[in-house]
Amino acid sequence: MKIQIKGMKQLSNKEMQKIVGGKSSAYSLQMGATAIKQVKKLFKKWGW
């Protein structure tokens, strides 16, 4: 699974696991999705 955010390099599974803390899959995916939403909000705020 690769996730790409505008203008950022793709994140590998290992990097994603670090970001979401590598907890249980469902929890990690939920937290990952939440984190991505927050990041996208920040990017909008910064005009990216």
From Swiss-Prot:
InterPro entries in the cross-refs: Bacteriocin_signal_seq
Propeptide: 1-25
Segments crossing the lipid bilayer: none
Sorted UniProt keywords: Antibiotic, Antimicrobial, Bacteriocin
Function text: This heat stable bacteriocin inhibits the growth of closely related Lactobacillus species. It may act as a pore-forming protein, creating a channel in the cell membrane through a 'barrel stave' mechanism.
Assembly, per entry: Active plantaricin A is composed of an alpha chain and a beta chain.
Protein name: Bacteriocin plantaricin-A
Source species: Lactiplantibacillus plantarum (strain ATCC BAA-793 / NCIMB 8826 / WCFS1) (Lactobacillus plantarum)
Gene giving rise to this polypeptide: plnA
